[in-house]
């Protein structure tokens, strides 16, 4: 029965074959392979003998005259077909069997070529329908065979089959995503005042090919990684019928559909595209964000390096959610934040043999920077001093380091710190985190620093619109936030381009994180969080531009020698520029001046004057408070001395000369110290007035029209 499947094919005959490039020529049959129902053929090409193995289906499709001549037993239910069409009908029946399973590659046992494996009832039905159409008698057997078999199908390798399976899954996934988008599009609210814009966004999204980031995507190595995370619309935005104007079509692209209005009041969309290392849509969980951002940095601290991870964005865009964990109402699940996930991996790494032998100890600190001041969140918000020692190492005096043994210890510290972090109300948000929260995981070996991982939840970046506020405290908050974000950007710039000088003294944030920007084994990741609502479009664009600016600075490391010069003015205007900006007289002022020069598009001379006035005022405030505290302590000693003098006067024969001399000495000392303190207070009040006048000189930028 097996040899019958080969029909009239014999060893030594010539058959037509089709090459992979489409050519058809003759070749001689050299062997018949019964195990896999194929034949081996050989031919001579350019003087060389070549050969290949071809399955019977392909041979019969090109050589229909070699098909087996078996008689088909007719069905008892219908009369037998005419003899003239019997051969054609056998070919038709064979084709129907193959076509019915073409979507699923057949096994060797189920491949059907001869008629003995087909159902007998199929034959008369096919032949009778063919007779009714009058097509069988009008064509030759060869033409019918070519027509019914169609183009020859080649056997597929396992690799091709796997690729087809992956492609099928991909197409299925895209179809599901398309159906989901269409379902969302159908749920539009025609009563929405922005219905026209909503339709424009829907039509634009319909033309995109979506390929979002998945956990199967590879993790790239970056010294500076910049990514963006979009959050979903919250309940308040949904109730206000706000629109989602952010689209993330692929793993590294973010698109903003900014509504605009022409002079004739016609509304239109301005679609702006940004590209980053990674882009996370609103369905990405914290674990996925951590996998691509902070997780690659954990190993850095075990290799004696410094790692830094920032969460940056508008208030309410998801920074604290990303760093601290999921919120359920007002309660936060700290175990799902990047703080805890990083700590978990640190303790897992400690168990590896190559790190276990180092006998490393893990410590944690948690502090906040508010209006240029540093407070310890693990020690009842004690105010700390940031000083630079003789070795140019920045020391946070009084900062407590708590040793942690497991992830649960870390979660407890995070709960303690989050409970007392500073927040307030601004013109941009009713509940704004107005401080930079810095959580550090420190590795020490025999008491010496081995590595440090700094995780920073930055304050809301509402572009410092509050620098022109009537409230001084709000002004100072906004000024410090803006200055620290500018300084952070320039420090990352210096890190990415290996610059000899890093302007870390320009703000308290970068001063505290100095060791994270100095050294070859330093790595940084920035997570820019954005709100999807149309009402937040301006702040979202500002966040993306800031992140894009940071990424631009590190896109082409080979162009480090072609860095834009700091000075953008001809040499003969340097003196005028020095006059305009003023001459720095301290390291802090020099770095601030350098910072403003490198960001002239964002920082005007008036704004630089304001920042300078704020810095001077903050320094004087610290000095006045410190002197006042010293005077208070001295006053306690004065009271004791005066009490002793008064007790001496109660004696009958006390020494009047001694009493007068001692009292005069106490009064002179009081006058000298209090006069000095009074002069400093006067200077401090003058600095307050100067800051207020400088704030009035700032030209507020006009908001971008929607």
Swiss-Prot record:
Coiled coil: 660-699
Taxonomic source organism: Homo sapiens
Domain Kinesin motor: 223-553
Signal peptide segment: none
Protein name: Kinesin-like protein KIF2A
Keyword annotations of the record: Acetylation, ATP-binding, Cell cycle, Cell division, Coiled coil, Cytoplasm, Cytoskeleton, Developmental protein, Differentiation, Disease variant, Lissencephaly, Microtubule, Mitosis, Motor protein, Neurogenesis, Nucleotide-binding, Phosphoprotein
Region (Disordered): 66-139, 165-186
Subcellular location: Cytoplasm; Cytoplasm, Cytoskeleton, Microtubule organizing center, Centrosome; Cytoplasm, Cytoskeleton, Spindle pole; Cytoplasm, Cytoskeleton, Spindle
Disorder named in the UniProt entry: Cortical dysplasia, complex, with other brain malformations 3: A disorder of aberrant neuronal migration and disturbed axonal guidance. Clinical features include early-onset epilepsy, and various malformations of cortical development such as agyria, posterior or frontal pachygyria, subcortical band heterotopia, and thin corpus callosum.
UniProt similarity note: Belongs to the TRAFAC class myosin-kinesin ATPase superfamily. Kinesin family. MCAK/KIF2 subfamily.
Subunit structure: Interacts with AURKA and PLK1. Interacts with PSRC1. Interacts with MCRS1; the interaction enhances recruitment of KIF2A to the minus ends of spindle microtubules which promotes chromosome alignment.
A Gene Ontology BP annotation from the UniProt entry: microtubule-based movement
Main location: cytoplasm
Residues recorded as bearing N6-acetyllysine in the entry: 102
Biased composition (Polar residues): 123-139
Function: Plus end-directed microtubule-dependent motor required for normal brain development. May regulate microtubule dynamics during axonal growth. Required for normal progression through mitosis. Required for normal congress of chromosomes at the metaphase plate. Required for normal spindle dynamics during mitosis. Promotes spindle turnover. Implicated in formation of bipolar mitotic spindles. Has microtubule depolymerization activity.
